[in-house]
């Protein structure tokens, strides 16, 4: 099923309603030996339950700079039209609003031109947010801005990455208490990945590290969960051992072609309850999702993705509700 998203320049955000047992901001609530209790309201068990709250970054100060091999190529050949890119981001916002997702924002800062990619500066977990450690100097300020955002929202921090660089696009909750951690060296170093892995092992989670060439930037370029035991994977560029691991866990794989993947076609957002936001250019994935009965909202991301990321890169899930 295709979904048409109505554009409304006077969109109103869904009103945020918290339950009575709210959570309070603290800088670290992780218990060093494990056993950290899940938050009362915020967080999620997996990346496929119904999305109720999402964190986005503003595109107000977006610039097209050479942040990766992907953005470097488009900058050289066909630089992004920033006004069109910003309009496409508004279409993405409209999709979340259309599906009733409460949208929260980082505060816009002119010194942070890549702030629109809200996935990377933090990670949400059942236990609180993790402030990551960005690899590139021009993005490190996003970590400090993210800390302020969580303080403003009243969301506690689980911890902060200190052992090495680590970016949120490399934290992939495959299913309940199971995380796939990417390590491409260019953005997430093994030291940072091992630190985060150690935390979740102590919480009793199953963990798996995925090593890949830094060309692919983050693991969410090639592996993204769709629904319970249904995962989109680019088989052409994903380590076979990861695919075998997923299949052994009972996951059905939807293959995304390599050409689509390097154009961010596997970088989409599952909203849960059979709804998915997908880049318009990812036609093969859209067709295969519809064949599985999903409601697919296609958003044109052709200009904004030139700056280095896709739909999944632009969103940090803050809360998913398994009962919604």
Q: Which residues does each PLM region occupy?
A:
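The feature marks the mature, well-folded catalytic cores of soluble enzymes
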Residues: 2-324
């Amino acid at each position: 099923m295709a979904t048409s998203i109505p554009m409304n320049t006077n969109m109103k955000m869904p009103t945020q309603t918290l339950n009575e047992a709210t959570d309070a901001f603290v800088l670290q609530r992780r218990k060093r030996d494990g056993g950290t209790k899940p938050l009362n309201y915020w967080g999620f068990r997996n990346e496929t339950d119904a999305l109720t709250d999402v964190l986005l970054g503003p595109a107000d100060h977006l610039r097209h700079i050479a942040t990766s091999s992907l953005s470097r190529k488009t900058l050289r050949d066909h630089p992004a039209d920033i006004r069109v890119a910003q309009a496409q981001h508004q279409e993405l916002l409209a999709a979340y609003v259309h599906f009733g997702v409460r949208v929260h924002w980082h505060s816009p800062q002119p010194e942070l031109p890549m702030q629109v990619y809200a996935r990377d500066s933090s990670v949400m977990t059942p236990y609180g947010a993790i402030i990551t450690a960005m690899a590139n100097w021009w993005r490190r300020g996003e970590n400090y801005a993210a800390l302020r955002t969580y303080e403003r929202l009243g969301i506690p921090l689980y911890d902060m990455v200190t052992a090495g660089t680590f970016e949120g696009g490399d934290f992939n909750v495959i299913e309940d208490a199971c995380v796939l951690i990417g390590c491409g060296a260019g953005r997430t170093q093994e030291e940072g990945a091992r630190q985060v892995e150690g935390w979740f092992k102590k919480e009793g989670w199953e963990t798996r590290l995925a090593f890949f060439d830094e060309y692919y930037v983050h693991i969410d370029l090639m592996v993204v969960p769709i629904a319970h035991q249904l995962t989109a994977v680019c088989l052409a560029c994903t380590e076979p051992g990861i695919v075998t691991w997923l299949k052994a866990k009972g996951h059905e794989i939807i293959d995304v072609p390599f050409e689509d993947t390097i154009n961010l076609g596997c970088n989409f957002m599952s909203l849960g309850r059979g709804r998915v936001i997908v880049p318009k250019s990812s036609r093969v994935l859209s067709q295969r999702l519809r064949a599985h009965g999903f409601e697919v909202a296609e958003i044109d991301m052709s200009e904004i993705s030139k700056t280095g990321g896709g739909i999944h890169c632009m969103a940090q899930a803050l809360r998913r509700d398994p009962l919604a």
